[in-house]
Each structure stands twice: as C-alpha cells, then as structure tokens.
C-alpha cells in the first residue's frame, strides 16, 4: 500500500536526489524557467516555494538556511536580492508547472517550471553576458 509515502524517489539515492534538486533549484533561480521531466518539476515546486518564503523573511538565519540547500552563493544572493522582494506581497504560489508534451526518445512526460511573474530577460542572460565578454576580448 502507498500510505504515507511523502515524495517521489525518482530511482535515486537520498544524496543524489538532494544534489539533483539543489542544482535544479539553482538553475530555476538563475534562469527563472527550466524544462525538465514532469515528476522532477512536481517535486521541485515545494522546494522552491520554501526557498522563496525564506527569501521573503530576509534575515541572516533564513539566508544561512537557503545557503545550506543551494550550491552557489550567487543563487542565494539572487534569491534574496531579486526574488524575495518581488514576491513580498504574494502569499505562496510563486512557481507554476506547465506540461510540455513528451520527450523524443523515451516518451518521458516533460514540463516547464517557471516563476509566476518571471523576468523574460533572465533566461539566457548569463550566456549573453559571456558572449559579449568574449567579443570584447577579441576586439
């Protein structure tokens, strides 16, 4: 029986799941929209909701708790500097999961997970900055 099963195991160990969701949460915070499989997106949603709630609190303890879950300091900084103030008035429901068809090859159900009031310019901004820096070095 499936009683009291709290989360999807995704055929991974605890450490692998923890690393997977830390990386995915960082990518979502950086790009504000990512494409992944539907079960991973559904499991990522409560993790992101809790991180944004920590960012809304904004104190030192909340920052340390977020840093314990995320891998990179720049993601923690972006979470507290941009996303926390953006959702200060919203009481939950910071991300949405949209179904995006099936993956060619294994027919895995795909989904797009994104922030509700996302900045469309955030997606690919790091790549654009890198390309501009490389072009500046060439000149």
Curated annotation (Swiss-Prot):
This protein's UniProt keywords: Ribonucleoprotein, Ribosomal protein
PROSITE patterns listed in its UniProt record: RIBOSOMAL_L17
Membrane recorded as keyword: no
Pfam family of the protein (one): Ribosomal_L17
GO MF, one example: structural constituent of ribosome
GO biological process, alphabetically ordered: translation
Domain of life: Bacteria
Keyword Ribonucleoprotein attached: yes
Disulphide-bonded residues: none
GO cellular component: cytosolic large ribosomal subunit
Assembly mode: Part of the 50S ribosomal subunit. Contacts protein L32.
Entry-linked NCBIfam families: L17
HAMAP family linked to this entry: Ribosomal_bL17
Similarity remark: Belongs to the bacterial ribosomal protein bL17 family.
Protein name according to UniProt: Large ribosomal subunit protein bL17
Organism: Cereibacter sphaeroides (strain ATCC 17025 / ATH 2.4.3) (Rhodobacter sphaeroides)
């Amino acid at each position: 029986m499936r009683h009291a099963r709290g989360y999807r195991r995704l055929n991974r160990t605890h450490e692998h799941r923890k690393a997977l969701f830390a990386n995915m949460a960082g990518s979502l915070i950086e790009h504000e929209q990512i494409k992944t499989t539907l079960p991973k997106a559904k499991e990522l949603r409560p993790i992101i909701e809790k991180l944004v709630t920590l960012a809304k609190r904004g104190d030192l303890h909340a920052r340390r708790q977020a840093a314990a879950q995320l891998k990179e300091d720049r993601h923690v900084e972006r979470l507290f500097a941009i996303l926390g103030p953006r959702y200060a008035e919203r009481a939950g429901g910071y991300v949405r999961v949209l179904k995006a068809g099936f993956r060619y090859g294994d027919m895995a159900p795909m989904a797009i997970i994104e922030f509700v009031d996302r900045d469309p310019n955030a997606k690919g901004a790091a790549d654009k900055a890198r390309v501009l820096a490389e072009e500046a070095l060439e000149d």
